[in-house]
Amino acid sequence: MNAYMTLSCKVGSFNRVLDELIKLNLSKKDVFLLFGPVDILVRFSGLKDLDEFISKWFNPIRNITPDEPMIDKTQTLIVISEGRSFTEEPYAFLFLNTQPRNLELVQEALQNIPQVLSADTVFGPYDVICAVRAKDIVDLQQLVSRIQNEVPNIQGTITGIVASLY
């Protein structure tokens, strides 16, 4: 089982939250600082089940720094169907919405685009989370436009650009 968690942090606290996440033994390769709709995206792979996710990750993360709450909001995205695994750091993550009956079609079409590193279908506020590579912001703009024009049945896209962790 795989999952993602998005974290929206109190203003100015994302560096401290990142430090606390690393203290929980999360790999830096699975923690992404984003410029976009959320501050941090965390990827979890190889989970046995939902109970393991809740006890090992969800509860500890939501309780980071209980004396001074720094996380305003979390969202959990449970992976329904995994896309390709990736080790390359993405330039951005796209959060996509489609009609439920089109999940597989959208996932397949996305994974046929060379700049798409992975496309996972998920339960949550979005239907697909997509890691992409781009050379720069212009390249990303062209890629998002291509996806919106070539991938059928997309109802909306939200982009989070990956920032350097430290």
Predicted regions located by residue number:
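A compositional/biophysical signature of low hydrophobicity enriched in polar/charged and small residues
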Residues: 1-166
